[in-house]
Design a protein with these regions (language model features):
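Helical subdomain adjoining the active site within ATP-dependent kinase catalytic cores
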Residues: 1-161
Length: 161
């Protein structure tokens, strides 16, 4: 069912582990709400609806990837990093189940730039992010491979339904 699909996706998507239980429940619900529209559509209508939002797919994928990187590098830390908090908020916006609510690539770039200007971002916060990214490259690659394997298994199991 759609409920099962949403529940399993949220549970297995390691990028979401850094988010609160209440956020994950809300995200799961938004997936169900969005996918319900396809129940009354023909296969062709569903494909057309999905393809209408192809320009948001890369942004969605990159946002999941960066959330995974953040999880791998910073999950155990309790230190507040202004850049990280705001960047995570931007990424969350771009993984919205409803593609109409995701930012365009252009708007994402603009929003990203304002993280440096509007927030008066400290160079130390961004530098800390880059240093940890460099130090944890191997863990990041391993985590991405694990996530790919998990998603392939999910895809196979749901394809059989």
């Amino acid at each position: 069912t759609i409920d099962d699909l949403a529940r399993v996706y949220v549970k297995k998507c390691s990028a979401l582990t850094i988010l609160s239980y209440s956020f994950k429940k809300m995200y799961e619900s938004s997936i169900v709400t969005y996918l319900q529209q396809f129940l009354t559509m023909t296969k062709e209508e569903s494909i057309q609806t999905i393809l209408k939002y192809y320009k948001t797919w890369d942004n969605f994928s990159l946002s999941i990837m960066y959330l995974n990187i953040i999880k791998t590098i910073f999950f155990k830390e309790k230190k507040e990093n202004v850049f990280l908090l705001n960047f995570t908020g931007l990424l969350i916006r771009n993984i919205n189940a409803n593609p109409e609510k995701r930012l365009s690539i252009k708007k994402t770039k603009e929003t990203y730039k304002t993280l440096f200007l509007k927030l008066n971002l400290k160079n130390k916060d961004f530098g800390d992010f880059l240093n940890k990214f460099e130090k944890n490259k191997i863990d990041i690659i391993k985590e991405n491979k694990t996530q790919d394997n998990t998603l392939q298994k999910l895809q196979s199991s749901f394809a059989r339904l």
